[in-house]
Structure formats: structure tokens, C-alpha cells
Swiss-Prot record:
GO terms for molecular function: 2-C-methyl-D-erythritol 2,4-cyclodiphosphate synthase activity; metal ion binding. InterPro entries: MECDP_synthase, MECDP_synthase_CS, MECDP_synthase_sf. This is 2-C-methyl-D-erythritol 2,4-cyclodiphosphate synthase. One of its GO terms (biological process) is isopentenyl diphosphate biosynthetic process, methylerythritol 4-phosphate pathway. Binds 1 divalent metal cation per subunit. A divalent metal cation binds at residues 8, 10, 42. 4-CDP-2-C-methyl-D-erythritol 2-phosphate binds at residues 8-10, 34-35, 56-58, 129-132, 139. Its cofactor is a divalent metal cation. Keywords: Isoprene biosynthesis, Lyase, Metal-binding. Pathway: Isoprenoid biosynthesis; isopentenyl diphosphate biosynthesis via DXP pathway; isopentenyl diphosphate from 1-deoxy-D-xylulose 5-phosphate: step 4/6.
């Protein structure tokens, strides 16, 4: 078994679509970034790559890779799952926590867990929290996410 941890943070960009945990949150401002700004999906990618010893999200999808510009977090997770398979791993489970005032994760938690779980073919737990007004997430300047992933060798 292999364990990985990942994180991501992006500034909020008014008027940009808000993609989070593979879902579009209508009426919410999204995050700026090289791709869709889905910090939950990006943190999961980071955790999965870390667990497999395959680097990090910046190395695989960073700004030096123009073919990944404006791509969805779902597409990134699909690519990471492919890379894991090539490296001989499969996902056992994963968890991601979104840190920010908005969007509210709770009302769409089950949907997010289903979408991410389907992408990884494994259970994914999704949660949300705030920082009680502290830091860039508390001031509404950005959104962060942390994730863990458990992998096993494919048999």
C-alpha cells in the first residue's frame, strides 16, 4: 500500500465559472488558473501522483505544458488514473477537503463523491470547511484543498 498527500490553492476570479470536485457551481465565482481552477480535483491529482511516486500536479499538468491549458479537473483525474495504471497501481480510496467560504460543499457532497469516485473507480470522501475568517480563504480571496490517497499495487 502507498499513501500520498496533496494540496492546491487558487485565487478567486470574479465572473469565472466555479468548478469544484468535478461539479459546476452555478452563480459562484470560480478560481483562476492554468486549467479550470478545480482545487479539489487538483489536490486529489497531487495526492495520487505523490502516492505513486510520479511527481506532482505541477510537473504533470503545469504551465509549461500548454496542452493542459483550460482542461477540466475531471480530465486531469482521468489522466492521473491512466498514469497510475501504467505504473502498476490502483486507487483504494481517497479523501479531499475544500477550504473556503464558498462554494458550500455540503449540499452537493454526495454528488461530488459520486463524480470523483466514478472518475477514479474508488470511494472518494469529500468535505468542506472554513478558516473562520482567517487567511486568504477566510477573506474570500481564494480557495484551497487538501487530499489524501491510498493506492495498492495492481494484481
Amino acid at each position: 500500500m502507498r499513501v500520498g498527500i496533496g494540496s492546491d490553492v487558487h485565487p478567486i476570479e470574479p465572473g469565472r465559472p466555479c468548478w469544484m470536485a468535478g461539479l459546476l457551481f452555478e452563480g459562484e465565482d470560480g478560481c483562476s488558473g492554468h486549467s479550470d481552477g478545480d482545487v479539489a480535483a487538483h489536490a486529489l491529482c497531487d495526492a495520487l501522483l505523490s502516492a505513486a511516486g510520479l511527481g506532482d500536479v505541477g510537473a504533470v499538468f503545469g504551465t509549461g505544458r500548454p496542452e493542459w491549458a483550460d482542461v477540466s479537473g475531471a480530465a486531469m483525474l482521468t489522466e492521473v488514473r491512466r498514469l497510475l495504471g501504467e505504473a502498476g497501481f490502483e486507487v483504494v480510496n481517497a479523501a479531499v477537503q475544500v477550504i473556503g467560504n464558498r462554494p458550500k460543499i455540503g449540499p452537493r457532497r454526495a454528488e461530488a463523491q459520486r463524480v470523483l469516485g466514478d472518475l477514479l473507480d474508488a470511494p472518494v470522501s469529500v468535505s468542506g470547511t472554513t478558516t473562520d475568517g482567517l487567511g486568504l480563504t477566510g477573506r474570500g480571496e481564494g480557495i484551497a484543498a487538501v487530499a489524501t490517497a491510498l493506492l495498492r499495487p495492481r494484481v
